[in-house]
Design a protein with these regions (language model features):
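Active-site glycine-rich loops that stabilize anionic/oxyanionic intermediates
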Residues: 9-12, 74
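Active-site loop/oxyanion-hole signature of alpha/beta-hydrolase fold enzymes
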Residues: 15-71, 82-87, 235
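Flexible "cap/lid" loop of the alpha/beta hydrolase fold
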Residues: 81, 85-86, 90-129, 134
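Conserved alpha/beta-hydrolase catalytic His-Asp/Glu region
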Residues: 104-110, 122-182
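Short beta-strand/loop motif that positions the catalytic acidic residue
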Residues: 183, 189-191, 195
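Conserved alpha/beta-hydrolase "acid-adjacent" motif
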Residues: 196-202
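Catalytic histidine neighborhood in serine/cysteine hydrolases
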Residues: 204-223
Length: 249
């Protein structure tokens, strides 16, 4: 049995991992799904993903786990990699979903800061229509209106101040490739085949940095593969979790 923290995407809810949490628990693993976009997680700290990494470690410690595996999607993946910088010796396994190890380009960072400024001015109402095409794959948008509607609801429910903070933190994040290169516990990379934000080349680069770990490609899914194809992602995560030794590292 592994203790596992599931770290959600931006700007969504921990509920995005409901099916994966059920599948992992059914396989005998203990699962905690921290909320990363709350005042409790952020406090009054300056924007820095290390703050969220500290929060995850504290949540897991409170749950009785000094060592644990971590699976993060998109922003959750960035936080997972920040956790490696903070306390890699406490991480028994790593799953990176629809994320990237590279830092933002100057253009991408500028876009994040402009997004944050607009949310600070206008709130979240404009965000779903402006971002849903990037977040969800073409197949999901065309055939799964219930998924589109659920993602819209999660976005609109997000705390705008936390969203601003998180975008600023992600814009400033460092490259994490070197952190992956020294991590040699059970790892997997998962990517939606229709993900345009963190596409397959980014996934392959992370897998190579991790020493050639498996890459699970999820068909007909975009950036939010865990929501778009929950059963396929659940199977990939259970297969990974089953490789983690109890009590490791």
């Amino acid at each position: 049995m592994a203790a596992i923290a599931l770290l959600h995407a931006f700007p969504l809810s921990p509920a995005m991992f409901d099916e994966q949490a059920r599948a992992l628990r059914a396989a005998g693993h203990e699962v905690v799904v921290p909320d990363l976009l709350t005042a409790t997680a952020i406090g009054d700290a300056q924007p820095d993903l290390g703050v969220l990494a500290h929060h995850v470690r504290a949540v897991m410690s409170d749950a009785g786990h000094s060592t644990f595996a971590v699976a993060g999607l998109s922003m959750g993946g960035y936080v997972a990699m920040a956790l490696l910088r903070l306390a890699a010796h406490h991480v028994s396994g790593l799953a990176l979903l629809d994320t990237k190890a590279t830092a933002d380009s100057e253009v991408a960072a500028k876009g994040r800061l402009e997004y944050a400024e607009r949310v600070a001015r206008e709130g979240m109402d404009w965000v779903p229509s402006a971002t849903i095409e990037a977040l969800l794959g073409e197949t999901t948008r065309a055939t799964k209106p219930e998924v589109v509607a659920q993602v819209d609801r999660w976005i609109l429910a997000a705390d705008s101040a936390a969203v601003v903070w998180a975008q600023q933190a992600m814009a400033a994040r460092p490259d994490s490739t070197a952190d992956l290169a020294v991590f040699r516990r059970p790892a997997v990379v998962i990517v939606g085949q229709e993900d345009t934000l963190s596409p397959l080349p980014e996934a392959l680069a992370m897998a190579a940095a991790l020493g050639g770990v498996p890459v699970a490609e999820i068909p007909t899914s975009g950036h939010l593969s865990a929501v778009e194809s929950p059963s396929a992602v659940s199977r990939a995560l259970v297969a990974w979790a089953d490789r983690i030794s109890p009590g490791a590292p």
